[in-house]
Amino acid sequence: MAILTAEQVEYTYQTKYQTVYALRGVDCAFESGQMTAIVGTSGSGKTTLLSLLAGLDVPTKGSIRFRGQSTAELDRDGWRLENVSVIYQNFKLFAHLTALENAAYPLYLQKRPKKEAEAEAAAQLAAVGIQPDQFGRCPRMLSGGEQQRVAIARALAAGSELILADEPTGNLDDENSRNIFTILQELAHERQRCVVVVTHDMELAQQTDRVVRIKDGRIAEEE
């Protein structure tokens, strides 16, 4: 059963001369235990759709629904904190925090005791291959692949049901890209998370459970 749905979603924005349709009539559903890739050319609307799914913006028309309820009717900040983790291409780690503190950050926001939060963060860092002697390092002391693993550990520590990733392997070499994709697959299949990934890498996209192709703001194909 779908945990997250887009129903007749339209998203527009205004330029000086015209109304631009970034998305038109988008219908799609996403399930727990499944990894979905959203693909399309630059400007096709795939990142806009991911932002709407994450509750970072609201559709101009139509609705995004989580367990049947429109996200527009929810306290979106509270809903995101409890249910959504977004993994970005540029990692979005805090430069002044250690790997452990970055991974624990969503638990700090949830008011979890510091010791408990950092114990959970340490467990998730270990799960994605970050070694204990790296826990105290700031992001600048980690490689790109290691920083992305910290970002994924942060998503794991948060306990989010929805893991949404925007080009998570875009800055990584082939080996690290495959490793990160494997971790995301394990999140979906072994931890029963709903994982949605925007990617331009068709080879990696074909390894997901489902591929949604967007063209000119519309869903052109699903496979």
Where are these regions (language model features)?
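Helix-to-loop junction immediately C-terminal to a conserved catalytic motif
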Residues: 54
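Conserved catalytic motifs of ABC-family nucleotide-binding domains
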Residues: 159
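Conserved ABC ATPase signature
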Residues: 138-142, 146
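The feature captures the beta-strand-to-loop junction immediately N-terminal to the Walker
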Residues: 39-41
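ABC ATPase NBD coupling module
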Residues: 71-85
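Conserved ABC transporter NBD signature motif
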Residues: 62-70
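Conserved ABC ATPase "signature" region
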Residues: 115-133
